[in-house]
Regions:
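Cys-dependent protein tyrosine phosphatase-like superfamily
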Residues: 1-126, 138-237
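Ser/Thr-glycine-rich phosphate-binding loops at phosphate-binding pockets of nucleotides
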Residues: 131, 135-136
Length: 237
């Protein structure tokens, strides 16, 4: 995969100092924000002047709890135990990953992202959600699969988020424990698991058959743009 064309991240609400300088050096022209309206309001991106933002709310049509609502549950030990206990947290995220494939707002968001990357006028580009692991993780995973990266390498790349976010969520887990909660309840929400990506892949194969068919029929990306996307992102042998 060519370097310097597509980037992923968590939200950019704390971008400043050396990080802002490093970001500017990447020459990123467009940021695609996959978050909900309440997430964007809670922590707006801080971007260099001249960087365009495109909002692609993946979960706009979801009837499940929003990410901000889930975080609010962390403050109530009883509600957290009810929602996340007995495998509830993992089951909730598996539902969300299934929504990434079938939800109309998700397909619209990912279609617009893929179409823009295929066109190339927006690049270098970056896409992100709040933690950069779920909505962003699925986008990165199916992009890599579409480009022909082997399944095991895609899974390994997806699971890197678990290591990189471990320190980020440590204060949240410690605070939950200090209030008397069991931090293990929150682990399914603050990390990534193979079963999450496998759930999305299973739904994709069930509904569309192949990655290429998902991009063509689920996202509505036609032959020309699909060819353009591969040509732009695959490094020549």
């Amino acid at each position: 995969m060519r370097r310097g064309i597509v980037y992923r991240s968590e939200d950019l609400g704390r971008l400043g100092g050396d990080d802002a300088i490093a970001f500017a050096r990447l020459g990123i022209r467009t940021v695609y924000d996959l978050r909900t309206a309440d997430e964007r309001a809670a922590r707006p991106d801080r971007l260099p002047a001249g960087t365009a933002t495109v909002v692609l709310d993946v979960l706009h049509g979801s009837t499940d709890a929003t990410p901000v609502q889930l975080m609010a549950l962390f403050e109530d030990l009883r509600l957290a135990a009810e929602a996340f206990g007995d495998g509830g947290g993992a089951a909730m995220f598996e539902r969300k990953y299934r929504e990434f494939v079938v939800l109309e707002s998700a397909r619209t968001a990912y279609r617009r992202l893929f179409a823009a990357l295929a066109d190339g006028a927006c690049t270098p580009a970056l896409f992100h959600c709040t933690t950069g692991k779920d909505r962003t993780g699925w986008a990165a995973a199916f992009l890599l699969l579409f480009l022909g990266v082997p399944d095991d390498a895609v899974m390994a790349d997806y699971l890197l988020s678990a290591d990189r976010l471990a320190g980020t969520f440590r204060p949240t887990l410690d605070a939950f424990a200090a209030r008397g909660g069991d931090p293990d309840l929150l682990l399914p929400l603050v990390g990534v698991r193979p079963s999450y990506l496998e759930t999305a892949l299973d739904e994709m194969h069930r509904s569309y058959g192949t990655v290429d068919a998902y991009v063509a029929n689920g996202l509505g990306i036609h032959t020309g743009p699909r060819q353009n996307l591969r040509a732009r992102l695959i490094e020549p042998a």
